């Protein structure tokens, strides 16, 4: 999904999760990597409930699920969609920056930690990678 269409659906979710819940500064939540990225959005009864993006360089990011839909498979479905898209376009590896509370989730999907924990937007993160077939 292009950013032009995805923006209307993904922006409210990202604002709720990152800006309101996690106190990420609003001015850094949207960036110049949104337009060239592939966006995946999950729906329930035509309402957008989760989102994520795949950057041209193979990084997955901006994974955000509305609170009431967490731990119900929405994040896994979005992640699978993005991984499948990376495989279809021929990526050999994908990477992401996981917030520490989400490292176990990404491990279950084949991602491995690399390097040390670092801080981004005031939140501890762990770089992770996964090889693709």
Task: Locate predicted features.
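Conserved catalytic-core motifs of GNAT/GCN5-like acyltransferases
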Residues: 97, 112-127
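Conserved GNAT acetyl-CoA-binding A-motif
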Residues: 84-99
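Conserved beta-strand in the GNAT
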Residues: 41, 46-64
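Active-site rim helix/loop that mediates acceptor-substrate recognition in acyltransferases
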Residues: 12-45
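A short beta-loop-alpha structural element at the N-terminal edge
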Residues: 1-10
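Conserved active-site tyrosine of GNAT-family acetyltransferases
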Residues: 14, 106, 111
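Conserved acetyl-CoA pyrophosphate-binding loop and the N-cap/start of the following alpha-helix
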Residues: 69, 73-81
């Amino acid at each position: 999904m292009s950013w032009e269409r995805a923006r209307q659906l993904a922006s409210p979710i990202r604002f709720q999760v990152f800006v309101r819940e996690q106190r990420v500064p609003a001015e850094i939540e949207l960036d110049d990597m949104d337009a060239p990225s592939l966006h995946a959005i999950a729906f329930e009864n035509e309402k957008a409930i989760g989102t994520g993006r795949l950057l041209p360089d193979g990084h997955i990011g901006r994974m955000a699920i509305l609170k009431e839909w967490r731990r119900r498979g929405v994040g896994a479905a979005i992640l699978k969609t993005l991984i499948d898209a990376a495989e279809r376009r021929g990526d050999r590896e994908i990477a992401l920056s996981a917030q520490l509370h989400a490292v176990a989730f990404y491990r279950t999907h084949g991602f491995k930690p690399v390097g040390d924990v670092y801080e981004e937007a005031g939140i501890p993160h762990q770089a992770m990678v996964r090889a693709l077939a």
